[in-house]
UniProtKB/Swiss-Prot annotation:
Covalent crosslink: Glycyl lysine isopeptide (Lys-Gly) (interchain with G-Cter in ubiquitin): K48
Record's keyword annotation contains Nucleus: yes
Protein name listed in UniProt: Ubiquitin
GO CC term, one of those recorded: cytoplasm
Transmembrane segments: none
Propeptide boundaries: 77
Domain of life (superkingdom): Eukaryota
GO molecular function annotations of the record: mRNA binding
Disulfide bonds: none
Amino acid sequence: MQIFVKTLTGKTITLEVESSDTIDNVKAKIQDKEGIPPDQQRLIFAGKQLEDGRTLADYNIQKESTLHLVLRLRGGQ
């Protein structure tokens, strides 16, 4: 299925995923497309930050859902 990931710059990335994919998998796909290391990615859906070990199905993310990508910069918290 296709999902969309919107970045803070307003760019939208289209990803091909399965419901059973983990958030880790999704971050790896974003890294492939955008070169952003997964440890710098925070994915938000429906106001919730998505945890790496969970699947898209756990969050009820369905086809053509839009996730929001926020970058976590190195350094301070």
